[in-house]
């Protein structure tokens, strides 16, 4: 259920603000969004996988906190990110 290394690197490359950037909120939110999408698909098939459900809820909460941080620090970057990711906020 973990992200494939190539997929993760492509996400990092797409959302990085500078070369080698892996810690910016944009990159972290993009990686979390992909993991959330993957786990959501897993949960559609395995409805009773409560350990995964708990991890999924933790990731959603972490992404929500990062988006909130980004919204409070730089609203333009926040709006651009949710537009690129297709998130509803």
Swiss-Prot record:
Keywords, sorted A to Z: Ribonucleoprotein, Ribosomal protein, RNA-binding, rRNA-binding
Described function: One of the primary rRNA binding proteins, it binds directly to 16S rRNA where it helps nucleate assembly of the platform of the 30S subunit by binding and bridging several RNA helices of the 16S rRNA.
GO cellular component: cytosolic small ribosomal subunit
Record field: transmembrane: none
Name the UniProt record assigns to this protein: Small ribosomal subunit protein uS15
Quaternary structure note: Part of the 30S ribosomal subunit. Forms a bridge to the 50S subunit in the 70S ribosome, contacting the 23S rRNA.
PROSITE patterns: RIBOSOMAL_S15
Organism in which the protein naturally occurs: Paenarthrobacter aurescens (strain TC1)
Gene Ontology BP, a term: translation
Family, per entry: Belongs to the universal ribosomal protein uS15 family.
Top-level lineage group: Bacteria
Pfam family name, one: Ribosomal_S15
Keyword RNA-binding: yes
Molecular-function GO term, any one: rRNA binding
Entry annotated with the keyword Secreted: no
UniProt gene name: rpsO
